[in-house]
Amino acid sequence: MADFVGAVDQGTTSTRFMIFDHAGNEVAKHQLEHAQILPRSGWVEHDPVEIWERTNSVIQNALRHGNLSPDDLAAIGITNQRETTVVWDPRNGRPYYNAIVWQDTRTDSIAAALERSGQGDVIRRKAGLPPATYFSGGKIQWILENVDGVREAAEQGHAVFGNTDCWVLWNLTGGPDGGIHATDVTNASRTMLMDLETLDWDDELLGLFDIPRSMLPTINPSSHPEAYGQTRTSRPLRAAIPIAGVLGDQQAATVGQVCYAPGEAKNTYGTGNFLVLNTGTELVRSQHGLLTTVAYQFGDSPAIYALEGSIAVTGSAVQWLRDQMKIIKSAAESETLARTVEDNGGIYFVPAFSGLFAPYWRSDARGAIVGLARYHDNGHLARATLEAICYQSRDVVEAMEQDSGVHLDVLKVDGGVTANDLCMQIQADILGVPVSRPVVAETTALGAAYAAGLATGFWQDTDELRTHWQESKRWEPQWSEDRRAEGYAGWKKAVERTLDWSKVE
């Protein structure tokens, strides 16, 4: 009998395969990083072939670590870094270009031109998104316009698009030999090409980017027993296992954090931060810089929508301290170093390396450290980096409360940065509400597993999934209201200093 569900978690810096039991507990996992390709300032790419090879390896190694066979898996889910764009030849599986990553800003002129022409409001109304470098539509257009032969190939049916969920799914289900070219509603909602009401590709939006509809994958529910097919026996699993769930990473974390009721929210701390608030079957149009997106759709049930605040640089700011500045040797050292000081000493670090995402949407912003004096040392910079993660989250929480009218009583958190206890305490202090971390911190992979397991009957319903969630640790706010207000005022002033640095044509 198949007693487990697996999940491919294809992220920005790594790919992992995780295996869960009926109680939602982790049984085994394996993870491998892939290269970050940085050809020039503002450009971020990944090698799709390397990602597929890593996917093969992590599946095989996780099964081996768990002493399991493929037949022990009832189903597989896929979750992924959203927006990251792959265009490949379906005849042979060869990418025409590297994957253009969600952080990449090369399409800033495309986004700016759409806004100037008045088309930004069309995109907001239909897709729920502002025209921004973040989303896939402009990335596809850039490849069509700048990579030799791709436009012609697309017109002949020899170039197809997918985010990395689609790329992994296509390869797992056969690749050039009948691979399924499909995605789910959550990933499609991040392209600027899907109408949120019809849950289908929109011809007017496609026309804005001059993208042939034939390039695009079929859009399916996030959880479905048949829509995504089965793994091919010639592929890494050597068995036909149903792929029954697909979700973008932040929507998967929302499912994994069991935020199934309107008003429930979670914040994932990874390379960036992503705060998602369930708004139920109601489409809430943001007036304060947030995104309207699809949270999930299970089977034939109506789609559940969400408001999202996406922050480009949070955990990657800690990586910057490690890799570029070399003031720490590991991410964990950021906490140790930050604890050497009592506060930030009056300095603020705004890590706008890729511009500012929600709620500002300023691609012209660039990173800044302000308030420096000779007194400051590495401890203050480490502390300011952790505070930057938390202040950016407060920006989003305030916008979310204005849009929804929902006051946050507790913030559910997950992701790698939540292992940093000091950062989570700072988050509670800056927000003024408790912060709660679950026992199973890998909620992104868990959410993909839940979607697959629900579709195949491994789990009965969301009520059963709620019983799995347990709190591991809670942080209560300790700052006074005066300190909280003073700190946030300083942060807002620092943000102003980052604007108008990068010219947008």
Curated annotation (Swiss-Prot):
Sn-glycerol 3-phosphate binds at residues 12, 82-83, 134, 249. The keyword Kinase applies. Inhibited by fructose 1,6-bisphosphate (FBP). ATP binds at residues 12-14, 271, 315, 319, 416. One of its GO terms (cellular component) is cytosol. Belongs to the FGGY kinase family. This is Glycerol kinase 3. It comes from Streptomyces avermitilis (strain ATCC 31267 / DSM 46492 / JCM 5070 / NBRC 14893 / NCIMB 12804 / NRRL 8165 / MA-4680). The gene is glpK3.
